[in-house]
Amino acid sequence: EFQSIQNRIADMKVYLEAARLAVYRVAASKDSGTALNPIAAAVNKMYLGDRGFEMSSEAVDLFGGYGYIHDYPVERIMRDAKLGQLGGGTSDIMRMIVARFMMR
């Protein structure tokens, strides 16, 4: 029942698990004393920021009108996720960093 909504939630779960693995990779690198290279940092920042906002926006859509009301946490989560895209360099800046590295 409501297969379309189930599919959207499943996609969100896939993005969440990929993001979790990226964070674990950075944490393991830090724990081992290995420096994370700047390109990996830019890739993670870009991916996590974009997917975080995409998933939170999707959640707002799934909540319908309630997704925009302050009574539900999904509205705040989307605002916070937008800051994740912008803080520390926008996704466009991260793309430029990655592209410059790839063009070497």
Q: How does the language model describe each region?
A:
Residues 1-104:
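Alpha-helical interface subdomain recognition
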